[in-house]
């Protein structure tokens, strides 16, 4: 039984038409995996940071008409929520899974994290070639970190501070045919490796 890695059934959830039918498919197919990943990686992050991390599985409760285009589990040090804090995420759209760390527009800690990342520009640029950067967690679009020079990365960081809706996230994406999505063992190893390499941007 597939407990952790996403399969075509999970990606196909987002092809189901209508809010209620899609939510039924999501709850039956994908949410159990997000809950399992939440338990596994809240423990992993707690062990590697000496802080207690809590999982937050997306419920999509605010949606009244439009079905969700993605779903996720987020990890933060607050038991009640994650949006106000720097946090880690595992989730998927219809065409790729994502493993991310960053901060979104609701957080009052954007300036603190931007100052930290400004001191880590060289470390960020030295991430593996398949690491990505994105400035809107609700959109699929991203760039590879490898494609950026120092000035371009600094513009991303400056935007985090200077734009009210500014966000900044780093991580990896995995397409449905990616080797990491062929088994639970491979996916857990890929997520562990991604989080481990992102931890210096958090600690």
From Swiss-Prot:
InterPro entries: UPF0637 (IPR009403), UPF0637_domain_sf (IPR053707). It holds the Pfam family DUF1054. Coiled coil: none annotated. Belongs to the UPF0637 family. This is UPF0637 protein MCCL_0722.
